[in-house]
């Protein structure tokens, strides 16, 4: 079956594995009987997100390509040569041209896992998607695509299969994993875009290994919303996780698509397809690509996954939240918590003097808001980077510099 957060109630799809082999349970999310949906769990459940749509989701396994500007030594630029999100509609390339450009960078991922049953150990297979991010075999996908895998196979668009594949790192907070195909030097990497300039209503394309059977299936749609927060679990009610700052799209994201690319019409990767709403049509979600640029830099430099860490608990401010709690701004990150300190002791934030009740409005001059959630903005950086935060404290604006730490799993 596909290893995904899936929209189907019985989210089980057979792969090419023998019928006697059990399939992996898909991550399932069931919506409540009626809206509004229950809030996702975050560090701040008390204030969190009366405005947040909490949807039970199923993760979707998909693979996509990221065209990075790399030479044979894997020197990589994560800044696109142009902003493909603001291209005028009249000059947008056709979907077919986008697919022609990106398909070689989108791979199918097949995993083997061992499951314990009342009859003993049994082998199960699952399928998802991935994105080529370097010529020498680094692949970006969702963590849930390769979770508990004993073996991983990567299949290119032309059918070439590689079995010498290792999981080189995971970022559980972003549901991201990195794979490495050993012994390759000539893969085509996908081009990484800039998710900070994505517009609601913008046309997008999704590619993935639909149902684990239909390699590089293409769908198209628009960005339906930004800054979504979600809560997801598997079919058994386990594997609960919260995801924030997500893009919402009506481009079809099928079981098996998790880990694949969400693309603008310039053929740039702007998101990683990750989840769909259960019991709904045309509601899929993708992780903004900027949120993983920091860990991507770390992996491409030959290091393990290192996620930048600041050490605060906060609430994303919305206009409704600002009105309810009489906050001075309608957007930003409100440093607050319910029953714990909102600034962790000895953290980078603590050392920089961040205090409970501060409102962070900018990161290195970029406004915190719907298009640029605080976690996504920090996710662009790596440990030891210094960022300047603009904050409101007692009604007065000031700036502080924070040296980011490394998140410890």
Feature-to-residue mapping (PLM):
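Exposed beta-strand face motif in extracellular beta-rich ectodomains
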Residues: 385-387, 398
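Acidic- and glycine-rich mobile interface elements
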Residues: 186, 333-343, 361-366
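Conserved PDZ fold ligand-binding element
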Residues: 139-140, 346-371
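Flexible, small-residue-rich helix->loop connector segments that border functional cores
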Residues: 98-99, 357-360, 389
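Intrinsically disordered, low-complexity Ser/Thr- and acidic-rich flexible linkers and loops
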Residues: 117-120, 339-347
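Serine-dependent protease modules
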Residues: 2-4, 8, 42-49, 53-324, ...
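N-terminal targeting leaders characterized by basic, low-complexity, disordered sequences
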Residues: 1-35
């Amino acid at each position: 079956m596909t290893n995904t957060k899936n929209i189907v109630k019985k989210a089980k799809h057979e792969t090419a594995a023998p019928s006697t082999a059990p399939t992996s349970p898909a991550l399932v999310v069931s919506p409540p009987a009626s809206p509004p949906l229950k809030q996702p769990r975050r560090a701040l459940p008390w204030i969190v997100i009366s405005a947040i749509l909490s949807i039970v989701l199923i993760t979707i396994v998909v693979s996509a390509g990221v065209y990075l500007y790399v030479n044979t030594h894997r020197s990589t630029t994560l800044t696109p040569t142009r902003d493909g999100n603001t291209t005028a509609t009249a000059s947008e390339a056709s979907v077919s041209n986008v697919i022609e450009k990106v398909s070689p960078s989108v791979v199918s991922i097949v995993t083997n896992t061992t499951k314990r049953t009342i009859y003993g150990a049994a082998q199960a297979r699952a399928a998802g998607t991935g994105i080529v991010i370097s010529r020498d075999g680094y692949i970006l996908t969702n963590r849930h695509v390769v979770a508990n895998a004993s073996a991983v196979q990567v299949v290119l668009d032309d059918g070439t299969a590689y079995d010498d594949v290792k999981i080189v790192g995971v970022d559980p907070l972003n549901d991201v994993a990195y794979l490495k195909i050993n012994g390759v030097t000539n893969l085509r990497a996908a081009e990484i875009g800039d998710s900070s300039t994505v517009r609601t209503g913008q046309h997008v394309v999704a590619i993935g290994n639909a149902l684990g059977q239909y390699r590089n299936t293409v769908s198209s749609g628009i960005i339906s919303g930004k800054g979504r927060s979600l809560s997801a679990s598997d079919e058994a009610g386990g594997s609960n996780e919260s995801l924030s700052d997500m893009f919402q799209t009506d481009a079809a994201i099928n079981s098996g698509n998790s880990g694949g690319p969400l693309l603008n019409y310039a053929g740039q990767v702007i998101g990683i397809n990750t989840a769909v709403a259960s019991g709904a049509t045309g509601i899929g979600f993708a992780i903004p690509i900027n949120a993983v640029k920091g860990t991507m830099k770390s992996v491409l430099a030959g290091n393990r996954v290192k996620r930048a860490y600041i050490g605060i608990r906060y609430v994303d401010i919305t206009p409704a939240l600002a009105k309810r709690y009489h906050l001075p701004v309608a957007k930003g990150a409100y440093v607050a918590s319910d029953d714990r300190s909102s600034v962790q002791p000895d953290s980078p934030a603590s050392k920089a003097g961040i205090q409970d009740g501060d409102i962070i409005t900018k990161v290195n001059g970029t406004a915190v808001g719907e298009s640029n959630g605080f976690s996504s903005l920090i996710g662009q950086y790596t440990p030891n980077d210094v960022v300047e935060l603009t904050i409101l404290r007692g009604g007065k604006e000031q700036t502080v510099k924070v040296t980011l730490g490394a998140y410890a799993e």
